[in-house]
């Protein structure tokens, strides 16, 4: 009996060993995601009223989407949107206003990578520039704040922004790469009254690469676009009214004095001082190359239809050769002067400093023909 019990116990033990489940495999341990980063990516923040500018400056890196709703930016204060987290989306809602102070600005500053800044339907950034306008612009009188610094932006977009009555220059684009601006409206028409607004450039571009501006509507009192330095810049499907037209320059006297590969395409220029202008500063050095104006229509130019000067800033002197203008194309450019006080085409080049120009289907009428053009390149004429 004892032997039988021992045998039975041995069998039960063997069964128990065979039936014991295998130890489960340990799962691979991975590091938990940073909860603070997840929070940042998922956070929508809204800032409004007179304290909104201060709060967004302190909290902007905690937000992936920032709504600026009816913001009232205090006097002497920049709406600080610099150094945003990659991928941040900023949306203006309602009317954004700015307190009055004589200072240089800017009123708004944005920087970062993969940033989107846009205006919601009906949103307005109102500079109320009449508080500063005195006919002097940036050349004297009251110190006036520039409006919007789009500096050090990479792979970013600014779209559907409506800016009204800027005190002085509007967009400063500097140190930017792969930046697209779409459907921007700049309305400074109130500044036409008594010629009080001045130097209200729409887009000033410097030291930037791969910049695209399309669908802009600019009503101002200075350059619609002024490209002082940069490469691969495209401006298209836009309207410029009341200002100084589509400008390269002024080039010279800066750290970077090279403008290369610029295209203006499908632009209407209305009631402006001139439609097309290239400005190389007298006595300075740099280069302007691969410039194309294509499908440009203009009407009622007051001073010039087309003007190219290598003695800008000192037009009483003989043009210099330090900023050559090469590979300059005009194609399908048609426009009118307002009256015979307007010179249809004026070219003032230094000796041998303008070359490889190609103009086709270019017509300017309604003004006077210049007899003072200098060193006009082969195949080009001031009498169209």
UniProtKB/Swiss-Prot annotation:
InterPro entries: Glyco_hydro_28, Glycosyl_hydrlase_28, PbH1, Pectin_lyas_fold, Pectin_lyase_fold/virulence. It is found in: Secreted. PbH1 repeats lie at residues 176-207, 208-229, 254-280, 288-310. Pfam families: Glyco_hydro_28 (PF00295). Keywords: Cell wall biogenesis/degradation, Disulfide bond, Glycoprotein, Glycosidase, Hydrolase, Repeat, Secreted, Signal, Zymogen. One of its GO terms (biological process) is pectin catabolic process. One of its GO terms (cellular component) is extracellular region. This is Probable endopolygalacturonase C. The gene is pgaC.
């Amino acid at each position: 009996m004892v032997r039988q019990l021992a045998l039975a116990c041995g069998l039960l033990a063997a069964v128990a060993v065979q039936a014991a489940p295998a130890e489960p495999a340990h799962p691979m341990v991975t590091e938990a995601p940073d909860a603070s980063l997840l929070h940042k990516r998922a956070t929508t923040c809204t800032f409004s009223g007179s304290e909104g500018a201060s709060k967004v400056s302190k909290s902007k890196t905690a937000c992936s989407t920032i709504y600026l709703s009816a913001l009232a930016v205090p006097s002497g204060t920049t709406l600080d949107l610099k150094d945003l987290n990659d991928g941040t989306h900023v949306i203006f809602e309602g009317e954004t206003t700015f307190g009055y102070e004589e200072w240089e600005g800017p009123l708004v500053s944005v920087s970062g990578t993969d940033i989107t800044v846009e205006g919601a339907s009906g949103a307005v950034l109102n500079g109320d520039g009449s508080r500063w306008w005195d006919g002097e612009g940036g050349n004297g009188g009251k110190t006036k704040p520039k409006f919007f610094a789009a500096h050090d932006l990479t792979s970013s977009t600014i779209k559907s922004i409506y800016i009204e009555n800027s005190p002085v220059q509007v967009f400063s684009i500097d140190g930017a790469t792969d930046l697209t601006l779409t459907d921007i409206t700049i309305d400074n028409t109130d500044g036409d009254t008594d010629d009080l607004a001045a130097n209200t450039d729409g887009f000033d571009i410097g030291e930037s690469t791969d910049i695209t501006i399309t669908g802009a509507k600019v009503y101002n009192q200075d350059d619609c676009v002024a490209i002082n330095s940069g490469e691969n810049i495209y401006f298209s499907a836009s309207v410029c009214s009341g200002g100084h037209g589509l400008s390269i320059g002024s080039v010279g006297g800066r750290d970077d004095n090279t403008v290369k590969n610029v295209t203006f395409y499908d632009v209407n220029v209305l009631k402006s001082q001139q439609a097309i202008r290239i400005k190389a500063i007298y006595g300075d050095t740099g280069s302007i190359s691969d410039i194309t104006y294509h499908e440009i229509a203009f009407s009622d130019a007051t001073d010039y239809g087309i003007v190219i000067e290598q003695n800008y800033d000192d037009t009483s002197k003989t043009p210099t050769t330090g900023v050559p203008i090469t590979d300059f194309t005009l194609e399908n450019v048609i426009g009118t002067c307002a009256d015979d006080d307007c010179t249809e085409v004026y070219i003032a080049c230094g000796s041998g400093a303008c070359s490889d120009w190609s103009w086709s289907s270019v017509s300017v009428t309604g003004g006077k023909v210049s007899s003072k053009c200098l060193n006009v390149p082969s195949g080009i004429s001031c009498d169209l």
